[in-house]
Amino acid sequence: MMVLGRIVAPFGVQGWLKIHPFGDDPAAWRKMTHWWLAEDPDGPESAWVQYKLASCRPHGKGLVALLEGVPDRNAAEAIEGRYVGAPRDAMPAPEKDEYYWGDLVGLDVVNETDETLGRVSGLISTGAHDVLQVEDGETERLIPFVAAYVLDVDLAARRIRVAWQKDW
């Protein structure tokens, strides 16, 4: 399951939900017919409950959405704080040279001389660009996810090649 965001609050009295998206393209979520909700983003697949998306629109830096089965504010309050996710195959296909963060987490990172720098443990959005969090034991590297440093992303090989030195 790919975690997309989190329900942060009810919105109004008719069951609408305010959503904080974790990615930079929440408008793509409107193309999905269903969302899945869970209390624990790392929980088993069976813990995710499917909801049909009735309506969704941008609101500030996030979204507001209406899910079937959430008819009023009380029902919205009952699911406040839950994570929003979707199976990978339910997601719209990314454009060329675009990636879902969930597809990058867990990839090995190597530099131009094939030195292993670690594995992607997460990403950070800084506003200007995204940053890879690369862990290698006790060492964490923060590598900007921009063309100047990221030379190649090979999802099939589960590897990212970067212009970055091991001692940086």
Curated annotation (Swiss-Prot):
Keywords: Chaperone, Cytoplasm, Ribosome biogenesis, rRNA processing. It is found in: Cytoplasm. The keyword Cytoplasm applies. The keyword NADP does not apply. GO terms for molecular function: ribosome binding. Residues 96-168 form the PRC barrel domain. SUPFAM superfamilies: PRC-barrel domain, Translation proteins. Coiled coil: none annotated. GO terms for biological process: ribosomal small subunit biogenesis; rRNA processing. HAMAP family: Ribosome_mat_RimM. An accessory protein needed during the final step in the assembly of 30S ribosomal subunit, possibly for assembly of the head region. Essential for efficient processing of 16S rRNA. May be needed both before and after RbfA during the maturation of 16S rRNA. It has affinity for free ribosomal 30S subunits but not for 70S ribosomes. This is Ribosome maturation factor RimM. The lineage of its organism: Bacteria, Pseudomonadati, Pseudomonadota, Betaproteobacteria, Rhodocyclales. The gene is rimM.
